[in-house]
Every structure is written in structure tokens, then in C-alpha cells.
């Protein structure tokens, strides 16, 4: 309660009082409420707050909703859903909305074969009867035909997993330099899986000059098997280095599997920026229940992942360099209030069939650290047109001889050692860098479906000169503005 002051002369004196106001009383009761009252023997006489074990009788609400099926679907509707779902399942441009509202366990066809009936494998009399034999082998099939099919499938899977050991002498092992193991370390793969786990949409960057060679099939199979709910986009970067018809054909073929876009990473003069932003906003609307989505950029080294992020932000937010391995760790970059981007280091998927030449041509290594680079010049001469090399370096007459080509170019540029010897290593590194950075026009043409003479390219196949389509002068001038 409130106490009033008493005026005695010129002084105001507050009387001494022991009364407590209501707030103080509630505070004291709160402190005492958690303790139980005990007698002299220590037994609890009165329980404290939340210590009582007495429970009131409860009963279920008499409501029909608690005792009936929550969701019911007829067989006809289920068949309709199953047919429509099977038609749209492999369409890369279709996305399933509200997956939790559908009986996915009934719609999805079981991929695994059902196990054989246990009674057919182990009869009751042979297991628990007088003739019981508990040590008999447990077979995975109920008949000889099923057993032979199971053995054949197991053999095919074994051959598929161990295909790298086919036609290889066990006593001979390939010896690679330490530099060729870059991009395959455990740390790099940990960074990749961090970015994949944190991303809702994954953009795989491909070099438009060699899309199949810079494609990570291992990551695609991992996403299909382990994380089918994540969205994948293929981005053909460096499309300014190849003709328009070639870009159109690659997009036509790759769009059958994933949404594919053409892109040219440039802060001042980009191409495909609006289409990519619009596509990411569509994915953001699909996840309207989230505050934001994350977009991860993965791919081979030197495919332009950081450059694409800088292009989308219209300023430099990630360090870039024309050499592979510039990005060491993953990093978050904000694009909009609802879209975040994740930059990831480049990875080189393991492939036992890849040779040293193929790894270098894909641009996955730093050429200055490679020993004897002149041995890879012959493959570059096969991939590039002769007239483009002549126009780039102003030399001619090497007749597809890599040694003579290096000698002519060294004397043209003046890169000679003591005694007038040719500096083959410096010339080879210069040519390989020009080849990777687009100063020498080249590209791998997509296989035409109607032309049987074309050879379908794979990840580990180098194309000879006669399989390439001649570049036009327009592409050459774009790649060499000073020529």
C-alpha cells in the first residue's frame, strides 16, 4: 500500500511501515511456490507447483473425425494420378507441387524386386518339423530361373562398377604427376557436398566449347539417387566462343535432361542474365513457404562460376582469375532478399579413362606447373583449324608437326635459349593458355541425330580435326578483336 509523508515543520518525514504492496506479495509467492511443505520427518505434506501426481480423468472428444480416415482415395483416381505422374516424371520442365498432399508411396512404382516368398524358400516342415535343417542356405530366389537372373544381374553390376580394370594389364599401372590430382582432394569434395547440402537449386556450369567433357555425371547421379528433391540447371557458359547454331543444338540436346540456358559472363555486356534471373525467381515461387532459397554453383575448374555470380550482382563480389583453382572455399553471396548464391570450388570427377591430355585440354590444371607441356601440343593442333592457328600466330608451313610448329612460333616470338635453341616449354605453355582462354577458336560440334556419320561424343573422347565443324570468320573476329 502507498504511504503518505507527514509534514513536521519544514521537514517531510515518511513513517516507518512494514506493509507490502500487491506486487511484492506476488513476487514472494512466486519464490515460495516451487517448494513443497514438509513435516518434521521430512515427508511432503503439500506439493509444490507441478509436483502433484494427481491427474484428472480425461476423455476423448466424441467427434467422428478422430475415428475415420483422414484422406481417402479411390482406385480409379489413384490410377489416374499414377499415369499422369509417370508421364511427367522425366520431363525436366515439370515440377511437382505440394508433394506432401499426394500418396507418393502408392504413386511411385517400386524399383526393387520383391523378395521371394519365405514359405517357398524354407518350408515349415523343414524348418520346425522332425526333418528340420536350420543350416540350409537361404536363397534369394524361389526357382532356378530367378536364381540365374539374379546371378546375371550381379555379374553385370560387378562389371559396370569395375569397368576401369577392363583391358588393363594388372602388372602395369599408370603413373600420373601430382599436379594431375588437383581438384580431387577430400577437402575439395567436402566443400562441394557442403554447397550441395545447403542449396535448393544447383546450377552446373559447362564450357560451351566442350559441354560433355566438362559435365559432372557423378554429381548428377548422386543428386538423382540421394537428393531427388533438389533442382538442377545446366548453364552453357562462354557461349560467345562458339557459333549460334552450335549453342542452339547443345541446348536442344541437353534440355531433354535438365533445364539448359546459354550464358556469357560479363559485368558490362552479359548474355542470358535476364533469363537466368527469371528462372531462379520461378524456383523461388515454388518454395513460397521459405523465407529464401539458396542456389549453388558447381562444375569443373575454370568454367566461370565466380564470374557468373559477379555478372548476376553486376559488380565484383567473388575473386576471379583466368586460371583454375582461384576459389578455395565455398561462400555465400546475396542476390536478392529471397535468393542467395553459393560459390563452390571447382571439382574434377574421378575417371580412370581420362588421360593427361584430356585433363589439360579441359582447363582443369595450371599449365605453369605441368612438366614437359610440349607433348600436348599435337592434340591441340588436331582440335584446331589450321587457318585459325595461322591467323592467330602469323606462321605457316608446319604440316601438322608439333615440333616444327613450336620451332616456327619460337623464332617468330623470339623465345630462344642460349645458342639459338628453341624454348619449347615456354612456347607450349603459351599455346595451351591461348587454347584454354579462347584466343584460338575451337569447339566440339554436337552429334546430329539425322547424320549417322557423326560420332557421339563422350566425357573421355578427344575429337580429331575431321570431326570438327569449321568456324566462321565472325566467331574468329569475336575471339580475336585485334586480329
From Swiss-Prot:
It comes from the Eukaryota. The keyword Protein transport does not apply. It is found in: Nucleus, Nucleolus. Keywords: GTP-binding, Nucleotide-binding, Nucleus, Ribosome biogenesis. GTP binds at residues 299-306, 343-347. The keyword Disulfide bond does not apply. Residues 189-350 form the CP-type G domain. Coiled coil: none annotated. GO terms for cellular component: nucleolus. SUPFAM superfamilies: P-loop containing nucleoside triphosphate hydrolases (SSF52540). One of its GO terms (biological process) is ribosome biogenesis. InterPro entries: G_CP_dom (IPR030378), GNL2_CP_dom (IPR024929), GTP-bd (IPR006073), GTP-bd_ortho_bundle_sf (IPR023179), NOG2_N_dom (IPR012971), P-loop_NTPase (IPR027417), TRAFAC_YlqF/YawG_RiboMat (IPR050755). One of its GO terms (molecular function) is GTP binding. GTPase that associates with pre-60S ribosomal subunits in the nucleolus and is required for their nuclear export and maturation. PANTHER family: GTP-BINDING PROTEIN-RELATED, NUCLEOLAR GTP-BINDING PROTEIN 2. Belongs to the TRAFAC class YlqF/YawG GTPase family. NOG2 subfamily. This is Nucleolar GTP-binding protein 2. It comes from Pneumocystis carinii.
Amino acid at each position: 500500500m502507498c504511504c503518505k509523508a507527514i509534514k513536521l515543520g519544514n521537514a517531510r518525514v515518511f513513517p516507518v511501515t512494514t506493509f507490502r504492496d500487491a506486487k511484492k506479495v506476488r513476487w514472494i509467492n512466486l519464490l515460495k511456490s516451487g517448494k513443497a511443505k514438509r513435516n518434521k520427518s521430512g515427508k511432503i505434506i503439500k506439493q509444490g507447483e507441478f509436483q502433484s501426481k494427481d491427474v484428472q480423468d480425461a476423455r476423448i472428444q466424441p467427434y467422428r473425425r478422430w475415428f475415420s480416415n483422414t484422406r481417402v482415395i479411390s482406385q480409379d483416381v489413384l490410377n489416374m494420378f499414377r499415369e499422369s505422374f509417370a508421364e511427367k516424371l522425366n520431363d525436366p520442365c515439370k515440377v511437382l507441387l505440394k508433394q506432401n498432399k499426394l500418396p507418393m508411396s502408392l504413386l511411385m512404382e517400386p524399383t526393387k524386386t520383391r523378395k521371394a516368398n519365405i514359405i517357398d524358400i524354407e518350408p515349415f516342415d523343414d524348418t520346425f518339423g522332425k526333418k528340420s535343417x536350420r543350416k540350409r542356405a537361404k536363397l534369394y530366389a524361389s526357382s532356378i530361373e530367378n536364381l540365374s537372373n539374379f546371378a546375371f544381374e550381379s555379374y553385370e553390376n560387378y562389371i559396370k562398377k569395375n569397368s576401369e580394370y577392363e583391358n588393363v594389364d594388372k602388372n602395369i599401372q599408370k603413373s600420373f604427376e601430382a599436379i594431375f590430382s588437383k581438384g580431387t582432394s577430400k577437402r575439395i569434395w567436402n566443400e562441394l557436398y557442403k554447397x550441395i547440402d545447403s542449396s535448393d537449386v544447383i546450377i552446373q556450369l559447362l564450357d560451351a566449347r566442350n559441354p560433355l567433357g566438362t559435365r559432372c555425371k557423378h554429381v548428377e547421379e548422386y543428386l538423382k539417387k540421394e537428393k531427388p528433391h533438389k533442382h538442377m540447371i545446366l548453364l552453357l557458359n562462354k557461349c560467345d566462343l562458339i557459333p549460334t547454331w552450335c549453342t542452339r543444338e547443345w541446348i536442344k540436346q541437353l534440355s531433354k535432361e535438365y533445364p539448359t540456358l546459354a550464358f556469357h559472363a560479363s559485368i558490362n555486356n552479359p548474355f542470358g542474365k535476364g533469363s537466368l534471373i527469371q528462372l531462379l525467381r520461378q524456383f523461388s515461387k515454388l518454395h513460397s513457404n521459405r523465407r529464401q532459397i539458396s542456389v549453388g554453383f558447381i562444375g569443373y575448374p575454370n568454367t566461370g562460376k565466380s564470374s557468373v555470380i559477379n555478372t548476376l550482382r553486376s559488380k565484383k563480389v567473388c575473386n576471379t582469375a583466368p586460371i583454375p583453382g582461384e576459389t578455395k572455399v565455398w561462400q555465400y553471396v546475396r542476390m536478392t532478399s529471397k535468393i542467395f548464391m553459393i560459390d563452390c570450388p571447382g571439382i574434377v570427377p574421378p575417371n580412370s579413362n581420362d588421360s593427361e591430355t584430356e585433363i589439360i585440354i579441359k582447363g582443369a590444371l595450371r599449365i605453369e606447373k605441368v612438366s614437359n607441356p610440349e607433348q600436348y601440343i599435337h592434340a591441340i593442333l588436331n582440335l584446331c583449324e589450321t587457318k585459325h592457328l595461322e591467323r592467330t600466330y602469323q606462321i605457316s608451313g608446319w604440316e601438322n608437326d608439333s615440333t616444327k610448329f613450336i620451332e616456327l612460333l619460337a623464332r617468330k616470338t623470339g623465345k630462344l635459349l642460349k645458342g639459338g635453341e628453341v624454348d619449347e616449354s615456354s612456347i607450349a605453355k603459351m599455346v595451351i593458355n591461348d587454347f584454354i582462354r579462347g584466343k584460338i577458336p575451337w569447339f566440339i560440334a554436337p552429334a546430329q541425330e539425322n547424320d549417322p556419320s557423326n560420332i557421339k561424343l563422350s566425357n573421355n573422347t578427344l575429337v580429331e580435326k575431321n570431326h570438327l565443324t569449321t568456324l566462321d570468320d565472325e566467331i574468329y573476329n569475336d575471339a580475336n578483336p585485334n586480329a
